[in-house]
Regions:
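A broad, structural surface signal
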Residues: 30, 34, 38, 81-84, ...
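Non-catalytic accessory segments flanking enzyme active sites
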Residues: 18-62, 66-67
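Short Pro/Gly-enriched beta-strand edge/turn motifs at strand-loop
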Residues: 38-49, 120-124, 308-312
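Rieske [2Fe-2S] iron-sulfur-binding domain
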Residues: 49-154, 158-168, 172
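Short, contiguous pre-domain boundary segments
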Residues: 6-20, 176
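C-terminal catalytic domain of Rieske-type non-heme iron oxygenases
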Residues: 75, 81, 142, 147-371
Length: 371
């Protein structure tokens, strides 16, 4: 079976060939800055990096640089990383904890709420210093799903409006409770859209990643389309590619996952297509004892992969216990250069939940003894 496509469009969009200019033209790159990067909500980082007062990190989207910080009042704020005196880059270190930001050029200081608080030798400015006008320029910022989102358009839609129905779809995964376990960034010599194009489709998987045939079933994936250019891809997990000959035994790559759930691989000899459903049953049955709360997730979400391609540059990949954030960013002035980021968040077992289940079982046993 080929992948299914679900979705409707108000206006029929004609198919046309995309020219290489969209990937190589400096003029097109400049148009993207105006029409896309300056208008959209973008994943800037993770909320766990700005938990304490004074915590900050820098989000670079060339040529812009944005400070995201937690103020002394515990508010979440974002500002352009630019001293308002002479336009010097204000903060060079990518993350840290500071009560105030000091410009390395003339020593102007800004509180972490953006207010200009100190101007060395201020008396030398004969007309005075208009502090309110020269405080840091704010950028819209919100925290959701354990991520920090920024938008440089002061008049644009809210984050909820930008995400639309996708917001409610992601919330059952409780990603805000997950911990960051991996943070990578690399430089690629290609246009940012080339990377997004690759990760947005599964057409290449059978040819470049043949090992995935024994993990999930790309040919039967379902693609859904949403307003704003977002898409969702649903992929059956804990199964095998339906285009391949069904193996007699469970593939080795699935053994550790089955063992963690107390499932014996020998029990599925000749019936490995039953693994997916049994994984759902086992997780539902033993999840809390293992420290995982699956109550908000559907059965399919316990075994499958859900991928959200968010316009313009983010790919969010969700499983019951893990969350990948993949992001492409333009690099410098070269259309044929970009950054590619990979963040991985994981739901760590909740010891309190495990203890609660243990206590409940102990209580049930005691009650049985009394009876």
């Amino acid at each position: 079976m080929s992948s299914q496509q679900v979705g409707t469009f108000e206006n029929e969009i004609p198919f046309k060939r995309i020219t290489s200019e969209r990937y190589l033209s400096p003029a097109y790159m400049e148009l993207e800055r105006e029409k896309i990067w300056g208008k959209m909500w973008l994943v800037a980082g993770v909320e766990s990096d700005v938990v304490e007062r004074g915590d900050y990190f820098i989000f670079d989207l060339d040529p812009e640089s944005i400070i995201v910080c937690r103020t002394e009042n515990a508010d979440l704020r974002a500002f352009y990383n630019v001293c308002q005196h002479r336009g010097n880059k204000l903060v060079a270190q990518q993350m840290g904890c500071l009560e105030r930001f000091t410009c390395p050029y003339h020593g102007w200081q800004f509180e972490n709420d953006g207010a200009l608080s100190k101007v060395p030798e201020e008396h030398r400015f004969s007309a005075g210093v208009p502090r309110d006008e020269l405080s840091l320029k704010a950028v819209r910022v919100e925290a959701w799903a354990g991520l920090i989102w920024v938008c440089m358009d002061p008049q644009g839609p809210t984050l909820s409006q930008y995400l639309g129905p996708i917001k409610e779809m992601i919330e059952p995964f409780q990603t805000a409770k997950m911990a960051l376990v991996e943070d990578q960034a690399c430089r690629l010599n290609c246009n940012w859209k080339a990377v997004i194009d690759n990760f947005s489709e599964l057409y290449h998987v059978e040819h470049i990643h043949p090992q995935h045939e024994c993990i999930f079933d790309c040919p039967t994936s379902k693609q859904e389309f949403f307003p704003g250019g977002h898409t969702r891809v649903l992929i059956d997990g804990f199964t095998v590619n339906t285009n391949m000959e069904i193996p007699e035994e469970v593939p080795r790559i699935q053994w550790p996952q089955l063992e963690a759930l107390g499932m014996e691989k020998e029990d599925y000899r000749g019936r490995i297509l039953d693994v997916r459903r049994d994984v759902q049953i086992k997780k539902r049955q033993f999840g809390k004892a293992l420290g995982y709360d699956y109550d908000l997730l559907s059965d399919d979400q316990l075994s499958d992969i859900v991928q959200y391609n968010l316009f313009p540059n983010s790919v969010l990949v969700l499983q019951a216990e893990e969350f990948w954030i993949l992001r492409a960013r333009p690099r410098g002035e070269d259309p044929n250069a970009c950054y590619w980021d990979k963040l991985v968040m994981r739901m760590l077992p909740d010891d309190d939940l495990k203890s609660q289940v243990s206590d409940e079982r102990r209580g049930a046993n005691n009650t049985a003894d009394i009876r």
